[in-house]
Amino acid sequence: IYSSRSVIATYIGSGFQLFVGGTVIVWMPSYLNRYYGMNTDTAGVLAAVIVLCSAVGSILCGMLSDRFGQNCPDRKVSLAISYCIGSCLFLSIAFAMPAGKSQLLLICMGMFIALGTNGPSSAMVANLTHNSVHSTAFATLTLANNLLGLALGPLIIGKLSDVIGLHHAFQLMPLVSIIAAAVFLYAKNHYHQDIARLTDQAVLPNLESPVDVMRKKNDDA
């Protein structure tokens, strides 16, 4: 697992992208309370709608990845890169705008594709690892998502918001998606090489050595 550059890059890229999605999910109720003057109940409901958008988007982006990656698996990597750049664009524009309906709409659109990398990342790990280690591979992906994304994101943005304010911290947050896109691009550059190596590793154990062939002939004789 850990000798494949594409797999390691997928872990890191997926984690960094969840840095963005996880941060918005955690801090959005507080953001709505501070900058929209919403009470806790209303902010919680609206934040839940945004989370729902990200959940639906994750499924639809995964379906799109399956559709376009059927005959060309590395297209899934390209889609993951597109999701990173798209979410960065939408969220950057959203948090550059003043509070209002337009901003909320753009946040929903950004979150719709922000978690869209979940599907392609899982598919890439499945394609690049042997069946015998799939459980370990997916557990490591989950660890990377939690460590680099869902845990680290809210922590860093929270610390940053104490210094420059939550709104300004949110303005910087989407830039992490650019890092995620760059890491996925690195994975794409090594994807075919790692696939070929995995195929060789699967075929070679099934090949009989000349010594085994001679031994069988002697046994038959």
Report each predicted region and the residues it spans.
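Interfacial helix-cap and linker-helix signal at transmembrane-aqueous boundaries
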Residues: 32-33, 64-65, 69, 156-165
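Cytoplasmic membrane-interface "Motif A"-like loop-to-helix N-cap segments
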Residues: 67-83
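A late C-terminal transmembrane helix in Major Facilitator Superfamily
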Residues: 58, 126-164
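Multi-pass alpha-helical transporter architecture, strongest
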Residues: 93-97, 171-205
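Conserved glycine-rich helix-kink/hinge and helix-boundary motifs of the Major Facilitator Superfamily
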Residues: 11, 44, 48, 81, ...
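Extracytoplasmic gate region of multi-pass secondary transporters
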Residues: 4-61, 114-122, 149-154
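Hydrophobic core of transmembrane alpha-helices in multi-pass small-molecule transporters
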Residues: 101-116
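A membrane-interface helix-boundary motif in multi-pass transporters
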Residues: 39-42, 75-78, 158-177
